[in-house]
Amino acid sequence: MRVRWLQFAVGALGLGFGAATEAIQIGLGVNAERVLIDFVVGETYLLGGLFAWGRQPRNRTWLLMVGVGLGWFVGNLAGSTDPVLHAIGIIFADLDAIFLNALILAYPFGSIEGRADRFVVATAAVGLTAANLLFYFTGNLAPNLVIGLFITAALAVLVPRRWWLAPPQLRRVLGPAVLAISVVLLAIGGLRTRHRPLGGGRGTGRP
């Protein structure tokens, strides 16, 4: 019962936080349809994580999904007129990408194994945040772009490699995910190269 109330509290917090940050975007004149799509994507991760929490609480994949869902909206704070919220929105704009990278490498058991996997997750967490901090003070996006492309390339190697080395039963589980992730990573890498750095800089790099 206590877990259910905690799930409800986290879900309510996530819904309220997401709605509040999307209101900031609407105030900036962002198209309502785009705001709605953005809201739905973030809440899908959040609610999916909460559902997984209820089904398999010992599998920490749910925690990473909730992290993606909540982190998805942090970059929206960059549009706030409050200087503190604005700074938070820029510096921590890549929280969703950081958690997503960890989620990709932790799937399906919820644990990150292997030095290379841990290195990529640590690089995403420290590197992207530091790059956003640099952008906040200098306006230079180049480090974020370089780190983002490195992470994209690393995942494009590590995820298929994990499938290749997995036993047959695990391959069946990883197969569809590997295909979907590979396509998404290639698309993201191409878009980042032309438009903005990986992780979105969701507050710093909204086109």
Sequence positions of predicted segments:
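Alpha-helical transmembrane segments of multi-pass integral membrane proteins
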Residues: 1-207
